């Protein structure tokens, strides 16, 4: 399975690693596969996603997958940020 996901899927197409990780975070949130989320949040940071971009990705999930699912993902993401020394709360963004 890992070979399919990380070999075949990740090596195809025009998406950047950052874009792939943000999409993976979205899919994990929507499917409530939250046990895999910490590793993917970390991978997104390593791929160049900013904490704000990761949070915005999750905020965009709320109207489509529901607020309760999004809150769980945000709580996990905040734990990853804290472990990485990322100060919370993040600066306000205008949207």
PLM feature spans:
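Generic hydrophobic/packing signal
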Residues: 49, 58-61, 65, 81
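Short, structured motif recognition centered on aromatic/hydrophobic residues
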Residues: 20-28, 57-58
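Mid-chain, well-packed structural core segment of small domains
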Residues: 35-55
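Short, charged low-complexity intrinsically disordered segments located at boundaries
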Residues: 32-33, 54-59, 88-93
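Short amphipathic alpha-helical segments at helix boundaries and their inter-helical linkers
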Residues: 29, 33-42, 61-76
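Acidic, glycine/proline-rich low-complexity segments that act as flexible tails and inter-domain linkers
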Residues: 1-18, 41-42, 46, 70-95
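Residues in soluble alpha-helical coiled-coils and helical-bundle/repeat scaffolds
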Residues: 10, 31-32, 49
């Amino acid at each position: 399975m890992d070979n399919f996901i990380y070999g075949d899927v990740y090596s195809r197409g025009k998406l950047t690693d950052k874009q792939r990780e943000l999409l993976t975070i979205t899919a994990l949130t929507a499917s409530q596969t939250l046990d895999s989320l910490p590793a993917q949040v970390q991978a997104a940071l390593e791929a160049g996603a900013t904490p704000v971009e990761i949070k915005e990705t999750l905020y965009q999930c709320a109207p489509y997958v529901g607020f309760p699912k999004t809150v769980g993902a945000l709580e996990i993401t905040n734990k990853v940020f804290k472990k990485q020394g990322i100060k919370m709360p993040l600066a306000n963004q205008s949207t």
